Amino acid sequence: MTEPVPVPSLPPPPPGDRPPGIQVSGVHAAYGRIEVLHGVDLTVAAGSVFALLGPNGGGKSTLLKVIGGQLRPTRGSVTLGDQPVGRRSVERLARTGLCSIPEGRGVFPNLTVRENLRMWTYRGHLSMRTVEERTYAAFPRLSERRRQLAGSMSGGEQQMLAISRALVTDPSVLLLDELSMGLAPLIVGELYELVAGLSGQGMTILLVEQFVSAALAVADRAAILVHGRIEQEGEPRRMAEAALGAYLSG
């Protein structure tokens, strides 16, 4: 009897050949009478990292809120995979595989590290043991801080704790707002290594970032949002110089 010939596993297709993980179509959004987004179109391939760049006040965080269901667009639509965001609540979107980590990190400062993790087990339907194993394997230093109040930790450690939500709930779509804000470059590099690893496991990641070099190091594609409009989109290397010009003029 002959041995079966092993079939080599194929590498994942490039981002341009994958179905959309996030589809934004003609989105307008406003705060009261002030329109902030003006007909934004954006496609993020499933399992890829997409960096959204641009100066402050350009609408980046607003777009994340629309995608995450925190702000309803005045016109246009958003789809996550094959699920329209529509009028779904943030909680319902979380159950369909969305995890959003806002600017400011989104941890519970008056709870310990371990208590924060326990709060997130309810969403992921995982045992506390599994949650701790996943978190401490990714961030060993959090194991040493597990009885410490989250609000008393450094900014980098708080961001690590925030990102552990993505490890706990295993979402299909992850939104990251200003991951590197206020952090040392060494910590930023460590966090983005994890982001790249999550994408390699099939997670679709959209990140808003001002730390351009760190974001473009892990991104498959990038776009520049200025005054509520996508001005340019393309490969990360091409976007680096364009992003610098946008910051200087924005």
Predicted regions and their residues:
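Helix-to-loop junction immediately C-terminal to a conserved catalytic motif
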Residues: 68
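Conserved catalytic motifs of ABC-family nucleotide-binding domains
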Residues: 170
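ABC ATPase C-loop
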Residues: 166-167
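The feature captures the beta-strand-to-loop junction immediately N-terminal to the Walker
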Residues: 53-55
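Conserved ABC ATPase signature
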Residues: 149-153, 157
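Conserved ABC transporter NBD signature motif
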Residues: 76-84, 96, 128-130, 137, ...
